[in-house]
Every structure is written in C-alpha cells, then in structure tokens.
A protein has these predicted regions:
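A residue-level signal for beta-strand positions that form part of recognition/binding surfaces
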Residues: 48, 57, 159
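Rossmann-like dinucleotide-binding domain that binds NAD(P)(H)
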Residues: 1-43, 137
C-alpha cells in the first residue's frame, strides 16, 4: 500500500544507493520493514528473511540455507532442517540435492527456469505452475515499489502510496 524509505550512498563515487531502510504498510493492515545494505561491516552476503506475527515467527538466512527457525509464543524455538521430520506439502518436487548439502539462491532461480520450461512445453500442471511464476503484473508492482521508495527518500522519507505511482 505505502512505503517510507531512506536511501543512502555511503561509498563515495558510487552511482547507486548502497544502503536502504524501508518501512512498509500493507493493504491488510500488516506492517513490515526492509533493511538492505552493501556496506554492513562484518556481513558477507547475508540475505535473511524474518516474518514476525502475533502467534510466532519464522526466520531463514541464505548463509545457513539448510536451517530455518520457527518460534511460537510460549514455546521453545524449533530449528527446521531440510530433510528433517517437518515436511511441507508440495516442496519435495523442488528439492534438487540430498539433505545436508546447501541449497538456496542458485537453485531458486533454477526452479523458476524449470517451471517456466514446463509451462512452455505445456506440461499437465501448467495452471498450477503459472501461479508460482513471476509475471508482468509482479514486475510492474516491484517497479512501483522501487519508484515509490525513491520518491519517498527524495521527499524526506514521507509516506508514499504505491497507487500514486504511474
């Protein structure tokens, strides 16, 4: 729905922002935040996704791709591992290598390419695969998000509604 962004270039001479803090308001009332940096001291190429809710949290990091942490209020946190006892329906077909070997960033793109090839070849589950693949509307929405973030940052981080972005 809307964003408030602070984009900064810390490295002199760099043409693009190398650090961003973005607050997000979603249509359903949920809120989120993004912290993105190419200049975070001590980090290598850390990509972490954390989702926090009123009943629990889920956290995954690219630097440890075989593990996710699941926490429920009032319960000890659980480490979920690839190939462990917790199975997620529909994911087995997307696993390319045995448990214990890291799987993540490159395999995610490989899965998109594989699903797109299946759609092009008219496989039986084409409609289901199309729901998982990024499409032009997804791309337009991401471009609106980026433009709204730049506009917000250029206007002292004022909240910017994505619907105002053309």
């Amino acid at each position: 729905q809307s964003v408030s962004a602070d984009l900064t270039t810390f490295v002199e001479g760099r043409k693009l922002d190398d650090d961003a803090s973005i607050m997000i308001r979603l249509n359903n009332g949920a809120k989120g935040s993004l912290s993105i940096s190419q200049v975070a001291t001590g980090e290598e190429n850390n990509f972490t996704v954390a989702i926090y809710g009123d009943k629990g949290a889920l956290k995954w990091s690219q630097e440890n791709p075989n593990y996710a942490t699941f926490s429920q209020v009032g319960e000890p946190s659980q480490i979920i591992t690839r190939g462990g006892s917790i199975k997620v329906e529909g994911t087995e077909a997307n696993v390319r290598i045995p448990a214990g070997h890291p799987e993540g960033y490159l395999e995610a793109f490989a899965q998109i390419y594989s699903d797109a090839a299946d759609v092009i070849q008219n496989k039986e589950n084409k409609e289901e695969l199309l729901k998982l693949l990024p499409n032009i509307d997804d791309g337009l929405h991401i471009m609106k998000f980026i433009n709204a973030s730049v506009n917000s940052s250029n206007n002292h981080s004022t909240w910017t509604d994505l619907s105002t972005i053309k």
